């Protein structure tokens, strides 16, 4: 099945506090520059390059910084933004369509997603990503998994290296030492696609969390599938992570273009 990617909105979860990041200025983590562009823009540009052009930001913490950035006339011109108003969704297929709204500073991820449905009335399929993870996902391959009639959701999995050396022991003797081996079970790196209908088939409690409660409920129903990603995967959790990615970029100015 061939899908028109421009009709698939992408929700970017960028309203959290990012407490481990320890921002050196008053900007939220997602607006920290990782190249010539902020983190969130590199993520948006990757999606845009791959055919998506509608992005929804349910804002919360430091929302004024995001609003200031996206409404800046220079940024609108530089990135070809088309800023959408919730009362007048006039899309421009040649531009990056951005819609943001205040989802509440204390809203968790799952609540933020549900609050986006106000703007997804005629949408059956949408994507979700985090505002601090880079990966060169092949989205068309990932989306093809939704052709399975039992699939209602797809997430990207990744075999990451352990941060520690692993040892095999017998009778207190070390038989084998593996320096930072690949972890056998893939980790969830986000980059989701959902059929909207599944959100109305799952019983949700008010305080339920996206990863802790909602995804396990999908798994129990056997409707959550995963796409194994074998390319890049970089997460910005701390200033050290940001410095590492900046170093990669400074070594190769085309780093993000190759993603």
Give the positions of each predicted feature.
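Conserved beta-loop-beta/alpha segment of the NTase-like Rossmann-fold superfamily
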Residues: 66-170
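Generic beta-sheet signal
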Residues: 13, 34, 58, 101-103, ...
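Conserved beta-strand scaffold positions in the cores of enzyme catalytic domains, especially
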Residues: 31, 98-100, 153, 224-226, ...
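N-terminal glycine-rich phosphate-binding loop and ensuing alpha1 helix
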Residues: 2-68, 72
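Short, flexible hinge/linker loops that cap or flank conserved catalytic cores
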Residues: 2-5, 25, 92, 120, ...
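Residues at the starts of beta-strands that form the adenosine-phosphate
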Residues: 9, 53-55, 125, 150-153, ...
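Catalytic-core segments of class I nucleotidyltransferases/pyrophosphorylases
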Residues: 126-127, 134, 139-147, 159-162, ...
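Well-ordered alpha-helical segments embedded in enzymatic catalytic cores
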Residues: 39-42, 112-115, 214
